[in-house]
């Protein structure tokens, strides 16, 4: 019994001693330090650091330890140097196994459990990122960004990520101020897209680093708490990062040493209410290299339910037909603004589709033009959307965001045109001018082959224009059957086969041409023909136009850098106006030089059809907008830069274009806003009214056939012009002959005056004419310049009666006339003249006729003829000669010549007072008075001897002189 007690005590003591020794052996203090030194570290990593409101395990920095050692005090350093060095105890080798000894690897695992745990978390995150990259980021080059904190504390994770990165990538380092060391990597070159993988300590600085991202995928791995992540996802800073995925580590309280912590994947929902708030959304979690929820889209589509009634601010300006502003007043005088137009209807449809509301506000700076004013305020962020029929240009795309083009518009020319060609031009309508030229040439050139085939020569045509004219009428009459030629030289009577073949060919050609013309003339007469319109810049440059456009809205600068030569030539003198109404007024009121206005084609057509169509009703001229586009533009909506609602609205516009809704809305606007020609709105028609009625038959009116009458009138006018030219040419030739004859007569008169003056100075008496039996002893009285009737005595032998007619100059009342015969010197005549002398004929003429003769042929005739003892006009003389053909077998000229020769014939064969023998044959004796005196005027006396014998009983030796007697008033009495 005692032995058992002693044995039990011994065992108990041994057990206590062995347990204490084993415990001291199993957990030695120096052993842990040796293991740490084995990894190259001097102390245990047992401290924690606070970073971005998250606790995490820190690392030991040898540089900081060295710095602390270098800056220690001398006393401390002396104490550290005096301290005893660490003594390494060798492992005790005991071949006896006590309990359950562990291997070295198990001991290392127990001592370095936190390192192994961090390694597992790192590998799990790297695996998750590789999976996301291969599934979502493979189409775009990813940009990996990390800040300084991650680079210093998690270099093992970055090394593992970059070593197994599946695709090409770009890396960037974020500086201490959350700015990139190389900002150029955020600006992609070319069409390649970008995606981002960001390692960041503070999640709230994400937008500052990368800015707004509308289309790029962003994967964010922050080192912040879950509460900070949710705050970021609900804040305004994450609203303009649409495709956002946040990976956050889940921190649990009961952390087991070998357990892996899961990663939670977050995103956000945009515009969950009318205020535009965001809400964080948990997608799934990642643990054990797999997702907790399979088949989850990590980048879901945002704004699928619209904007939840969010109210947008819309900037709008009047720009028809896209935005039309209408003012109306209510019963109390308040002004109400109502907006219409294509873009307004489009906005209403999109508001219902995307579930949002809007407020329309007009821009402030209207002097910039509707488009530029709206763009300026949207660029400054004063509105969420801009509507004003804004053209898509490079400068506007750089300053703002523009939607896809919902419509197209272009710059067009507005000109004044004729509504229809005049009906009188319808006779020329069936053929164009080249056809008319060809037909005329064919008929003209037909003369030569026909003439050559008939005569076998062309000599009879060369230089003979009258023959060529006759040939033309032969051709025209033969082919048109309007004239018939049966002469000896007519081609219709030819017997040559070649000529007949040519005539037949031309005849068939004429039949075909005539059939073509008559078949088309009815259509051109009954239906109006539209004239040529200005539809292109080539036509505009060929005409004389002044070109103008607006001085605002971009029109003043859009065409300055054109590379088109015709455009630069046309717009080098571009005029500017302040409004479209002023430009239209310049077009309609242009004088001498036409005016063309460049503007929006949609706006010009809208203004013409809605406001100006009734003004040009039943008028020959109207406004015309060119069909060709001078410059094509797309019409879009304007958004501020990096707008979240841009893509949903773009998708809605594309859906509406595919469905044809935009075309329907455009037709509705045209139907409800544009007016008809009578100024009323367009009205809908149903049933039978929509069917087009056939045109009713009608007879041709005078307006339809006025071209034919005008053609006939044109022929008469041309013929009258030719007749006048022939008459003028004949008168011109006659005047030339008269002037030539007058010059010769004056020359002869001057010679006779000189001879008469010489004879008068020698003899001092008048030349005496030969006597006749008719006027012998027959005195004739004549009133002298003093009013006394003087009888002209007979000659020395009493055979002739001398009369003097003063034709030029005027004698003074008191001047004696040496040629006047005293009254008692006259002798009585036994018989009277058979024909009246010229003086008697003149005395029988009325005073009115004498006044006409003196004043000249202003109202009556240019030629006075003395015929059968009477003064008459040339036309009366021609009629008298025509009536008395039995008596006068000769022409009027021969009759006049005979009458004048009988009237102006000297009776004397040879005068004794003549200076020369041939002076007796002259028509009259011309004597100059006062050879010794200075003469101021020249007076010519003509002695007329009226012969009493019968006509035709003249002596063979009688000299017949023919002269034209001209008075001082310059009238030609006889010729």
Curated annotation (Swiss-Prot):
One Gene Ontology CC term in the entry: plasma membrane
- Report the locations given in the UniProt record: Cell projection, Cilium membrane
Q: Which UniProt keywords apply?
A: Behavior, Cell membrane, Cell projection, Glycoprotein, Ion channel, Ion transport, Ligand-gated ion channel, Membrane, Receptor, Signal, Transmembrane, Transmembrane helix, Transport
- What's a single GO BP term from this record? synaptic transmission, glutamatergic
Entry GO MF terms = glutamate receptor activity; transmitter-gated monoatomic ion channel activity involved in regulation of postsynaptic membrane potential
The protein's recorded glycosylation sites are: 67, 177, 355, 464, 561, 586, 611, 763, 797
**Its topology with respect to the membrane?**
Multi-pass membrane protein
Disulphide bond pairs: none
Q: Which ranges are annotated Polar residues under compositional bias?
A: 760-777, 788-800
Where is the segment annotated Disordered?
A: 757-839, 911-938
Q: In which tissues is it expressed?
A: In both female and male antenna, expressed specifically in 3 sensory neurons of flagellomere 13 segment (at protein level).
Q: Does the keyword Transmembrane apply?
A: yes
InterPro entries from the UniProt entry: Glu/Gly-bd (IPR019594), Insect_Ionotropic_Sensory_Rcpt (IPR052192), Iontro_rcpt_C (IPR001320)
Q: What does this protein do?
A: Integral part of a neural sensory system in the antenna that provides the neural basis for the response to environmental changes in temperature (thermosensation). Specifically, required for thermosensing by the cooling cell. Plays a role in heat seeking and heat-stimulated blood feeding behavior.
Indicate what this protein is called per its UniProt record. Answer: Ionotropic receptor 21a
């Amino acid at each position: 019994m005692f032995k058992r007690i002693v044995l039990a005590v011994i065992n108990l003591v041994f057990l206590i001693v062995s347990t204490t020794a084993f415990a001291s052996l199993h957990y030695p203090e120096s052993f842990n330090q040796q293991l740490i030194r084995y990894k190259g570290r001097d102390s245990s990593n047992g401290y924690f650091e606070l970073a971005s409101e998250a606790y995490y395990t820190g690392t030991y920095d040898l540089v900081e330890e060295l710095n602390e050692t270098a800056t220690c005090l001398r006393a401390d350093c002396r104490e550290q140097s005096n301290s005893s060095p660490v003594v390494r105890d060798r492992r005790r080798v005991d071949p006896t196994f006590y309990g359950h000894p562990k291997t070295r690897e198990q001991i290392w695992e127990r001592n370095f459990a936190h390192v192994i745990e961090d390694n597992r978390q790192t590998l799990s995150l790297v695996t998750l990122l590789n999976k996301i990259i291969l599934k979502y980021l493979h189409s775009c080059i990813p940009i990996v960004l990390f800040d300084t904190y991650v680079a210093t504390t998690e270099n093992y994770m970055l090394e593992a990520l970059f070593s197994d990165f599946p695709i090409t990538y770009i890396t960037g380092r974020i500086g201490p101020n959350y700015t990139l060391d190389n900002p150029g990597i955020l600006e992609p070159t070319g069409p390649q897209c970008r995606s981002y993988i960001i390692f960041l300590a503070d999640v709230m600085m994400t937008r500052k680093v990368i800015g707004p991202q509308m289309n790029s995928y962003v994967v964010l791995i922050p080192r912040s708490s879950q509460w900070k992540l949710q705050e970021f996802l609900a804040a305004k800073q994450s609203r303009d990062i649409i495709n956002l995925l946040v990976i956050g580590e889940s921190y649990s309280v009961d952390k087991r040493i070998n357990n892996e912590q899961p990663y939670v994947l977050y995103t956000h929902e945009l515009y969950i209410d009318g205020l535009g708030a965001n809400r964080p959304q948990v997608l799934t979690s990642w643990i054990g290299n797999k997702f907790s929820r399979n088949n989850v889209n990590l980048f879901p589509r945002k704004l699928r339910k619209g904007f939840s009634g969010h109210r947008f601010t819309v900037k709008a300006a009047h720009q028809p037909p896209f935005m039309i502003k209408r003012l109306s007043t209510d019963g109390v005088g308040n002004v109400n603004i109502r907006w219409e137009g294509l873009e307004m209807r489009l906005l209403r449809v999109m508001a219902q589709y995307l579930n949002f509301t809007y407020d329309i506000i007009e821009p402030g700076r209207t002097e910039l033009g509707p488009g530029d004013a709206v763009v300026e305020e949207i660029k400054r962020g004063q509105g969420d959307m801009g509507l004003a029929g804004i053209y898509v240009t490079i400068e506007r795309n750089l300053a703002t965001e523009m939607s896809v083009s919902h419509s197209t518009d272009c710059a067009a020319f507005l000109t004044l045109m004729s509504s229809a060609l005049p009906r009188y031009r319808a006779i020329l309508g069936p053929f164009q001018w080249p056809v008319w030229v060809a037909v005329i040439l064919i008929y003209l050139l037909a003369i030569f082959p026909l003439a050559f085939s008939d005569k076998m020569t062309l000599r009879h045509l060369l230089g003979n224009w009258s023959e060529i004219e006759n040939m033309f009428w032969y051709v025209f009459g033969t082919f048109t059957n309007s004239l018939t030629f049966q002469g000896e030289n007519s081609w219709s009577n030819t017997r040559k086969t070649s000529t007949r073949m040519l005539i037949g060919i031309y005849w068939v050609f004429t039949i075909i041409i005539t059939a073509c013309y008559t078949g088309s003339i009815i259509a051109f007469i009954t239906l109006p023909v539209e004239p040529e319109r200005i539809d292109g810049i080539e036509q505009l440059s060929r005409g004389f136009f002044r070109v103008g456009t607006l001085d605002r809205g971009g029109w003043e600068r859009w065409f300055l850098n054109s590379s088109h030569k015709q455009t630069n030539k046309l717009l080098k003198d571009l005029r500017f106006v302040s409004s479209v109404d002023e430009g239209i007024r310049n077009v309609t009121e242009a004088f001498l030089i036409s005016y063309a206005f460049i503007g929006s084609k949609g706006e010009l057509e809208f203004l013409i059809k809605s406001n100006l169509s009734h003004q040009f009703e039943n008028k020959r001229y109207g406004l015309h907008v060119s069909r060709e586009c001078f410059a094509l533009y797309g019409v879009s909506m304007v958004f501020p830069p990096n707008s979240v609602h841009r893509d949903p609205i773009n998708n809605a516009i594309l859906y509406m274009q595919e469905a044809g809704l935009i075309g329907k809305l455009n037709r509705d606007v045209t139907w409800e806003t544009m007016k008809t020609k009578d100024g009323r709105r367009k009205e809908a028609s149903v049933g039978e009214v929509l069917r087009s009625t056939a045109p009713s038959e009608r007879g041709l009116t005078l307006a339809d056939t006025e071209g034919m009458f005008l053609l006939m009138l044109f022929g008469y006018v041309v013929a009258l012009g030719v007749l006048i030219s022939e008459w003028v040419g004949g008168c011109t030739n006659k005047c030339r002959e008269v002037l030539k004859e007058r010059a010769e007569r004056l020359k002869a008169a001057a010679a006779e005056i000189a001879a008469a003056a010489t004879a008068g100075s020698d003899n001092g008496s008048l030349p005496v004419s030969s006597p006749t039996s008719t006027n012998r002893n027959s005195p004739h009285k004549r009133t002298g310049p003093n009013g006394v009737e003087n009888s002209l005595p007979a000659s020395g032998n009493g055979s002739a009666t001398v009369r003097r007619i003063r034709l030029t100059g005027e004698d003074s009342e008191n001047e004696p006339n040496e040629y006047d015969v005293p009254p008692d010197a006259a002798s009585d005549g036994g018989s009277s003249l058979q024909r009246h002398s010229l003086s008697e004929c003149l005395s029988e003429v009325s005073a009115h006729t004498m006044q006409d003769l003196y004043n000249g042929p202003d109202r009556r005739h240019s030629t006075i003829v003395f015929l059968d003892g009477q003064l008459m006009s040339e036309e009366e003389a021609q009629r008298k000669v025509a009536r008395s053909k039995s008596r006068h077998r000769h022409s009027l000229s021969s009759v006049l010549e005979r009458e004048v020769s009988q009237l102006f014939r000297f009776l004397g064969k040879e005068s004794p007072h003549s200076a020369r023998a041939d002076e007796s044959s002259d028509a009259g004796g011309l004597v100059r008075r006062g050879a010794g005196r200075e003469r101021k005027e020249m007076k010519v006396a003509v002695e007329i001897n009226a012969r009493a014998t019968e006509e035709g009983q003249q002596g063979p030796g009688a000299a017949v002189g023919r002269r034209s007697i001209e008075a001082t008033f310059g009238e030609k009495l006889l010729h």
